[in-house]
């Protein structure tokens, strides 16, 4: 299997070319994903209400909390598959796919049930504005009921990513995006279901993308065919996936809890401020997508080359990726800060929402370059099998620094000051990751296996 089938062997050839060509489909897919998320926000902000806009924004960290654990396990699968593929052990690749899907099928019902039961308690913790309570609850219940599609898509993407294939994932996302936009227009504008229509559109689109992904992989790559209900579960191999992926999943879960802690404070300032925060968050996420895509590429690149015992290529690839991430982040941050007001106006005509969004961007975007360096280095270490240190680093920066400083600054200087806490957390975490990577402490995590 070679690049003609979408699968890329990154242990030979130009590291820059491999990373770039792997990143581009991921980037296009991430833009598509954010595009349909922004269509959701545009539709509800302009044709439903600010309460619906706040509901969609509040929903993200809650849904992320429930999907993050399995997303982390999928990342572990990506690393194990990449290392096996780079070392030419295709039987191990096959076993990893079977084990991942067997675990997914066994756990999806308990995850969904837990999510549905926790919707009301989490909304209480988040201090959701009473004016937006009903719409937020509706949105969360529907999206939580459809978690299978979101988690399943991430699993398919992780499997293909380990073998250097990001172009097929773009196809899955294209299907989801087109369908989601159509359903938004149909269920909100044509059939006025409000926030319920937005939630239904999201769930149906994700479910179709996941099922289409299984069909496509089984047809295109029969040697990698997914058997959701009759795969052979390799307990020892799955434990290795868990060793690498569980810290990443725990990190994502705790970061989601940290995000909910932030939202709890944000929600205390009212519906307009919450809507503005959510608009700003969407815009900063959009500008960060290239770095996110580069980080995903470096996981697969490092994994394959560690499997092939090419540490020289690992270091070369990481240097290239960090440089690309820094250049992009500096340019995009300057652009977003410069156009913060007109960009915010796209999503809401309310002056209070626009002002809150613009202020968020003006405070959060300047130190984003620190987060870019942190993100790429942590991803590189995960690709080498060292996922515990990145977890401790990021969780400490969010839970021990960002959230406490956010409350402290907001209470002392007002709501806008809370955003300074982002830069504080990123600066400390970035410095620690640079030290850990430069010291080479991540290398033994693979060699000892």
Where are these regions (language model features)?
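Helix-terminus/linker motif at the lipid-water interface of multi-pass membrane proteins
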Residues: 31, 35-53, 123-130, 186-193, ...
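Short alpha-helical transmembrane segments in multi-pass integral membrane proteins
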Residues: 1-23, 81-148, 190-246, 302-367, ...
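Transmembrane helical elements of multi-pass membrane transporters/channels
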Residues: 21-40, 142, 153, 176, ...
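Small-residue-rich hydrophobic transmembrane alpha-helices
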Residues: 53-113, 150-169, 263, 277-340, ...
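Residue-level signal for transmembrane alpha-helical positions in Major Facilitator Superfamily
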Residues: 20, 24, 36, 73, ...
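Transmembrane alpha-helix boundary and packing residues in multipass membrane permease domains
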Residues: 26, 30, 42, 79, ...
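N-terminal transmembrane alpha-helices
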Residues: 10-47, 61-76, 80, 108-112, ...
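Short runs within selected transmembrane alpha-helices of multi-pass transporters and secretion channels
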Residues: 74, 142-161, 169-177, 198-211, ...
